[in-house]
Amino acid sequence: MAGHSQFKNIMHRKGGQDAKRAQLFTKLAREITVSAKLGSPDPNANPRLRAAILAARAQSLPKDNIQRAIDKATSGGDAANLEELRYEGYGPGNVAVIVECLTDNRNRTASEVRTAFSKNGGTMGESGSVAFNFERVGLIHYPLKAGAADAVLDAGIEAGADDVQSSEDGHDITCRPDDLNAVSKALEAALGDPEFARLDWKPLVQVPVDADTVPALMKFLDILDDCDDVQRVAANYEIDDAIMEKLGA
């Protein structure tokens, strides 16, 4: 299993699912608000907002919540105080990690992320210290039911994508960041709405993680995901399927 950006945890903990879902809805709405604030409130004229709305719909965020998040961007208030931050460092097993945040309190967020690194076997670095391990890409994800692998590949090529990967988890289509809006629109015409379309961090080099390190790494990533200000976590780990099956048994 290769590491990737994630809104959901790889290893789900029992209990607290309602709280987790409420937290996810808050993060999705916050991304919509900031996207609308930085660009146009019209998703057809704002690729980032359009991607944020698609991601929210895929997670069943109610339509009224989506509209309120857009309205918040144009009415000022709390939205004016939100800023984007990015932190980088290494987690257990020397895995490179990028943490993307939206916050109204830079000091609070920095403290939470720094604590997550320092107390869980990680080391936080300077900006750019691990980004060279990743490539910035546009990522469009479809479920398996969207079509057979060959059909999705053909649609991806026709849409101008750079790569199409199909697995039991679905279809991942990547493109240049500047092409995300055009490629996603072309794919929608052929395959329908994706589960999400967003800018992502694609690992250029993957770090194998042994069985002894996996639990610590998963705990660390889980703690980062649980931070209210963290929007997305990218990590360049690779875990053998046999190890994952053993740990999940």
Curated annotation (Swiss-Prot):
InterPro entries in the record: Integrase-like_N, TACO1_YebC-like_2nd/3rd_dom, TACO1_YebC_N, Transcrip_reg_TACO1-like, Transcrip_reg_TACO1-like_dom3, YebC-like
Subcellular location: Cytoplasm
Cellular component, GO, one term: cytosol
Major localization class: cytoplasm
Domain of life: Bacteria
Gene3D superfamilies assigned to the protein according to its UniProt record, in alphabetical order: 1.10.10.200, 3.30.70.980
UniProt protein name: Probable transcriptional regulatory protein Rru_A1086
GO biological process: regulation of DNA-templated transcription
The keyword Transcription regulation is assigned to this record: yes
Family per similarity comment: Belongs to the TACO1 family.
Keywords: Cytoplasm, DNA-binding, Transcription, Transcription regulation
GO molecular function: DNA binding
NCBIfam families in alphabetical order: PRK00110.1, PRK12378.1, YebC/PmpR family DNA-binding transcriptional regulator
PANTHER family tied to this protein: TRANSCRIPTIONAL REGULATORY PROTEIN YEBC-RELATED, TRANSLATIONAL ACTIVATOR OF CYTOCHROME C OXIDASE 1
